[in-house]
């Protein structure tokens, strides 16, 4: 789950992380009053969308007068902001963050993530801040330092020394860095984040460390522990089909391919996607209906898959353990009749009540292609489209 920059900074502030003063605007009302509350000389007007590259796209601008603030908010609010992460269609800006300006002396990079290699939360830091970290990793990887944190000890003095050294924090900056590293780690772990990125982390001319930007992703599987964070979801930034799937308890992720997938079990779903690619097609989605799906839930899953206009065929791959194949078959037929499936449909069933499930499909008189195994199913769906 992603949130906006201003929401991320509000959370970090609760963990005593230094962030610039700022206020959010949800409309063009009260612009001057909001600006006066934030600063009295320099402001930064920031578009709030779930995408990077806002500055290069014209969504982050500096104002040096209240009149400039008003004009910039009027310009940015409602604009279709195009960045390297939005695609050519861009995203409409419906929220604008007004923040006090900072006198920047140096820009650094810092992030925390769950590192699969070390099986720990790791800091990724670099003296090359304010730029695309992927470019730094490709061109000058020696400028990036990774420090993995032992969950049994948390951030130790040795970790702080390593991080401070990597970022060249000396003198008065080192104790500030020490507090910052511990606060960011606490925020990451206690909030069940999957990514926390500060780019740039700046040193001001006054020799203060400030998080000038903040990107936060939460582990969606842990949101039941944080109902207050669920309220931060901006529906306008979410995929409509993914929101609908979530409401029905389905795990759905939209992809860019042409073969819709309906599978039970995350591992089987990923294997299905791999074999579809092996045969030269591309999966249009990841969709796991789980082990206790009902006929009604399978019908809703079909509706969600077919809401994607790029879908040219559907592959159903079910291994019936907890889920019965006859229930899936009834759901497939119900969905095919209700939503008028007009694309090729290949079904592979195996497991509990498989013969009954196959019989239900055969007697339905629908144009459903049966498959004996996953390889056969993937081959048939790619040939059918």
Identify the function of each model-found stretch.
Residues 319-323:
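Glycine-rich, proline-tolerant flexible connector loops at the mouths of alpha/beta enzymes
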Residues 326-330, 343:
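Shared catalytic-loop signature of beta/alpha-barrel
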């Amino acid at each position: 789950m992603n949130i906006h920059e201003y929401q991320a900074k509000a959370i970090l502030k609760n963990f005593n992380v230094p962030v610039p003063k700022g206020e959010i605007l949800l409309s063009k009302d009260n612009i001057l009053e909001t600006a006066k509350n934030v600063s009295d000389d320099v402001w930064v007007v920031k578009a709030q969308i779930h995408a990077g590259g806002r500055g290069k796209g014209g969504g982050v601008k500096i104002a040096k007068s209240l009149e400039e603030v008003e004009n910039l908010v009027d310009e940015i609010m409602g604009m279709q902001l195009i960045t390297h992460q939005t695609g050519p269609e861009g995203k409409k800006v419906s929220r604008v963050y007004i923040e006090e300006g900072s006198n920047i002396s140096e820009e650094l990079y810092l992030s925390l993530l769950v590192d699969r290699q070390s099986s720990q939360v790791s800091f990724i830091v670099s003296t090359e801040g304010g730029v695309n970290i992927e470019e730094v990793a490709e061109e000058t990887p020696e400028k990036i330092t990774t420090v993995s944190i032992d969950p049994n000890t948390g951030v130790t003095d040795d970790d702080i020394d390593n991080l401070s050294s990597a970022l060249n924090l000396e003198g008065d900056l080192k104790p500030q860095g020490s507090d910052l590293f511990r606060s960011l780690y606490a925020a990451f772990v206690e909030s069940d984040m999957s990514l926390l990125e500060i780019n740039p982390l700046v040193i001001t001319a006054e020799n203060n460390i400030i998080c000038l930007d903040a990107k936060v992703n939460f582990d969606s599987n842990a949101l039941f522990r944080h109902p207050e964070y669920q309220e931060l979801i901006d529906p306008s930034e979410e995929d409509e089909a993914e929101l609908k799937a979530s409401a029905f308890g389905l795990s759905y992720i939209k992809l860019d391919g042409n073969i819709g997938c309906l599978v039970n079990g995350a591992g089987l779903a990923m294997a299905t996607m791999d074999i579809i690619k092996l045969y030269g097609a591309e999966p249009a989605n990841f969709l796991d209906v789980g082990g206790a799906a009902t006929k009604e839930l399978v019908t809703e899953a079909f509706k969600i898959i077919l809401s994607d206009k790029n879908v040219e065929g559907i592959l159903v791959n079910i291994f019936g353990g907890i889920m019965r194949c006859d229930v899936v078959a009834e759901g497939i037929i119900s969905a095919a009749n209700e939503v008028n499936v007009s694309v090729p449909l290949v079904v592979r069933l195996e497991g509990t009540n498989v013969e009954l499930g196959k019989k239900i499909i055969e007697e339905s008189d629908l144009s459903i292609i049966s498959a004996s195994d996953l390889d056969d199913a993937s081959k048939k769906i790619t040939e059918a489209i």
